[in-house]
């Protein structure tokens, strides 16, 4: 056994967001300073994973709800964009680099998850190609900077899970979600609309295309706020909305359902919604972003 520390580089720095630490810090600070925090700290958040010029201000609404003084472990659940995966995968590295500071993976929790036999390992190549987890690392580092040596991360790449697998993983993660010192970050964009995404749902009663997209997204968002995994699955089957993080969201909803059985009282609220551009013609395209937080009462 070698004791060499293996690092995942910040492979999207310099393209999806700035590679300059001071510049990145100033941008994140700017976005966070424009946002209100709610009264209760978040136990879980849903936030987008696009380039920061598109979604940085939206994501701030979720990260503003994180309380660094109580958070000790951060589970980051992101969808797989590049490799076919029918389960969930764990990283094979020790450290995730960011332009702000390095984040340590929690090898103790990784050991517990690995023992279940429900996970596979992703290669370093897969890890560095994937942006769905990485785009949350600078925001995580920024939100936690006052306690930077006191927390670990648990990155999980979520595959194209069946409903029964979402339930199984939800059950597994529910015991971690029950712990107030854990935070779950669920990585998802919302509707990807236009020819390049092969998705062009349009409800003409809504008027302009972008309004139809917003109506469709907000229908899904209100179902997520009801914390009902079955209704969310049915919504996706009916409208096929291109929500890329639907499986991580499904896992979170199933974990919540599991905790509600034992009487835990939780609520989820979306705090911001945005679109990369406003579609008005069939030639246009856009991606939607939403940020929200789960609180425990």
From Swiss-Prot:
Keywords tagged on the record: Phosphoprotein
Pfam families recorded: Memo
Gene Ontology biological process terms in this record: regulation of microtubule-based process
Domain of life from the UniProt record: Eukaryota
Gene3D superfamilies: LigB-like
CDD domains recorded: MEMO_like (cd07361)
InterPro entries membership: MEMO1_fam
Residues the record lists as Phosphotyrosine modifications: 210
Function in brief: May control cell migration by relaying extracellular chemotactic signals to the microtubule cytoskeleton. Mediator of ERBB2 signaling. The MEMO1-RHOA-DIAPH1 signaling pathway plays an important role in ERBB2-dependent stabilization of microtubules at the cell cortex. It controls the localization of APC and CLASP2 to the cell membrane, via the regulation of GSK3B activity. In turn, membrane-bound APC allows the localization of the MACF1 to the cell membrane, which is required for microtubule capture and stabilization.
Family named by the database record: Belongs to the MEMO1 family.
Oligomeric and partner information: Interacts with ERBB2 phosphorylated on 'Tyr-1250'.
Protein name: Protein MEMO1
Gene behind the chain: Memo1
């Amino acid at each position: 056994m070698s004791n060499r520390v293996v690092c995942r580089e910040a492979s999207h720095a310099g393209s999806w967001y700035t590679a300059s630490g001071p510049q990145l810090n100033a941008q994140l600070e700017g976005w966070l300073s424009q946002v209100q925090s709610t009264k209760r700290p978040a136990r879980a958040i849903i936030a987008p994973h696009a380039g920061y010029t598109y979604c940085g201000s939206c994501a701030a609404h979720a990260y503003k709800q994180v309380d660094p003084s109580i958070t000790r472990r951060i589970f980051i659940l992101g969808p797989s964009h590049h490799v076919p995966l029918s389960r969930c995968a764990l990283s094979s590295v020790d450290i995730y680099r960011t332009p702000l500071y390095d984040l340590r993976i929690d090898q103790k929790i990784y050991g517990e998850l690995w023992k279940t036999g429900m996970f596979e390992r992703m290669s370093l190549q897969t890890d560095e190609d994937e942006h769905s987890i990485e785009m949350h690392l600078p925001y995580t580092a920024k939100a936690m900077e006052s306690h930077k040596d006191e927390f670990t991360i648990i990155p999980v790449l979520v595959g194209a899970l069946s409903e029964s697998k979402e339930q199984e993983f939800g059950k597994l993660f529910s015991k971690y979600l029950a712990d107030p010192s854990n935070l779950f970050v669920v990585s998802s964009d919302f509707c990807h609309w236009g020819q390049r995404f092969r998705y062009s749902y349009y409800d003409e009663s809504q008027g302009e295309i972008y309004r139809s997209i917003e109506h469709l997204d907000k229908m899904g968002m209100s179902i997520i706020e009801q914390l009902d995994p079955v209704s969310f699955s049915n919504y996706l089957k009916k409208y096929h909305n291109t929500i890329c993080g639907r499986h991580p969201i499904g896992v979170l909803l199933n974990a919540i359902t599991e905790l509600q059985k034992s009487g835990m009282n939780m609520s989820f609220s979306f705090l911001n919604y945005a679109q990369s551009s406003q579609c008005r013609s069939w030639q246009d395209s856009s991606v939607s972003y939403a940020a929200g937080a789960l609180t425990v009462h």
